[in-house]
């Protein structure tokens, strides 16, 4: 059973009718519903194409947050072999919101970092809903240092609403941890390929997203603040999030036009959650092509390119 978003009601109604017909056919073999099911499935496809071809920024935000959308661990299990997670920041604790470790991508040793939101209540609590604490960013910094030391390409997958804003996180130096992670991301002399697979929220995202090549999934979002947060600041009213989203330039199309990202990875009609294997396969191709291109550059070129790309974000807006 799909978790339908509010704008997907036409799809929900049609798929509900299909389920009813399938149930009827299973209960009475004399009833032939195949033609009607085929007709309704065609209408579902048409409805999805029509709806998803003109999503508003707020609707894309909803898709990026869809509970069934594939997250970091879904990508890791399909993109990499021999993925070995590493834990702890060697200072305070381990943070499961940041998943990081060593793996092979198409046989090549790589370092991998990403945010994991979880897919049910238990795992979401374990991963703190994808909002990293300071120790998570310090773990990311440690993995970046390791990648630089051993000359391993770095792949980062971004999916967070933002860094955890709790009092304890602030007491343990959240701002400093994000800044150090961003600095390390800019300074390493290995190729970095970043993909925003869901939400890219604020400094919590950019701390692992200053790559040589940055891509977004078609319905991902990337912003300095959530639409709800922006609405709360601008109008003291979080219910105006839809209005805020429309003015924030948070979609992949907007950010590509502004030069913030390098490319957009198409999603299956209906969003990544409708066909995770397809979108992960497309992501694999994009990462592979980017690493192949970047492998021809030396470390100094990679670092200079990445730093200039980061500085250009504010200049080009």
Swiss-Prot record:
It is found in: Cytoplasm. It comes from Rhizobium meliloti (strain 1021). The keyword Transferase applies. Its EC number is 2.1.3.15. GO terms for cellular component: acetyl-CoA carboxylase complex. Keywords: ATP-binding, Cytoplasm, Fatty acid biosynthesis, Fatty acid metabolism, Lipid biosynthesis, Lipid metabolism, Nucleotide-binding, Transferase. Component of the acetyl coenzyme A carboxylase (ACC) complex. First, biotin carboxylase catalyzes the carboxylation of biotin on its carrier protein (BCCP) and then the CO(2) group is transferred by the carboxyltransferase to acetyl-CoA to form malonyl-CoA. The keyword Thylakoid does not apply. Pathway: Lipid metabolism; malonyl-CoA biosynthesis; malonyl-CoA from acetyl-CoA: step 1/1. One of its GO terms (biological process) is fatty acid biosynthetic process. Acetyl-CoA carboxylase is a heterohexamer composed of biotin carboxyl carrier protein (AccB), biotin carboxylase (AccC) and two subunits each of ACCase subunit alpha (AccA) and ACCase subunit beta (AccD). Belongs to the AccA family. GO terms for molecular function: acetyl-CoA carboxylase activity; ATP binding; carboxyl- or carbamoyltransferase activity. This is Acetyl-coenzyme A carboxylase carboxyl transferase subunit alpha. It is an enzyme of class 2 (transferase). Residues 40-293 form the CoA carboxyltransferase C-terminal domain. It catalyses: N(6)-carboxybiotinyl-L-lysyl-[protein] + acetyl-CoA = N(6)-biotinyl-L-lysyl-[protein] + malonyl-CoA.
């Amino acid at each position: 059973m799909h978790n339908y978003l509010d704008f997907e009601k036409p799809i929900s109604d049609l798929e509900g009718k299909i389920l009813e017909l399938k149930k009827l056919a299973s209960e009475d073999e004399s009833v032939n519903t195949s033609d009607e099911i085929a007709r309704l499935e065609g209408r579902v496809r048409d409805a999805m194409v029509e709806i998803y071809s003109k999503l508003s920024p707020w609707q894309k935000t909803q898709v990026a947050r869809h509970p069934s959308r594939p997250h970091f661990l879904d990508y890791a299990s399909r993109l990499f072999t021999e993925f070995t997670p590493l834990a702890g920041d060697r200072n305070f604790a381990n943070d499961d919101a940041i998943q990081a470790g060593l793996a092979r991508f198409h046989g090549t040793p790589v370092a991998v970092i990403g945010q994991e939101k979880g897919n049910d209540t238990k795992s979401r609590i374990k991963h703190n809903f994808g909002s990293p604490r300071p120790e998570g960013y310090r773990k990311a910094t440690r993995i970046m240092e390791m990648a630089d030391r051993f000359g391993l390409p770095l792949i980062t997958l971004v999916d967070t609403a933002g860094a955890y804003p709790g009092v304890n996180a602030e007491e343990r130096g959240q701002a400093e941890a994000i800044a150090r992670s961003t600095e390390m991301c800019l300074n390493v002399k290995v190729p970095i390929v970043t993909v925003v697979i869901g939400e890219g929220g604020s400094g919590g995202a950019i701390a692992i997203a200053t790559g040589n090549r940055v891509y977004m999934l078609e319905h991902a979002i990337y912003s300095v603040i959530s639409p709800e947060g922006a609405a709360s600041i601008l109008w003291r009213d979080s219910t105006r999030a839809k209005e805020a989203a429309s003015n924030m330039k948070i979609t992949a199309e907007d950010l590509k036009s502004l030069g913030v990202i390098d490319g957009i990875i198409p999603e299956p009609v209906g969003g990544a959650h409708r066909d995770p294997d397809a979108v992960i396969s497309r992501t694999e191709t994009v990462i592979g092509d980017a690493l192949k291109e970047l492998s021809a550059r030396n470390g100094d070129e990679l670092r200079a390119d990445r730093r200039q790309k980061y500085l250009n974000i504010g200049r080009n807006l």
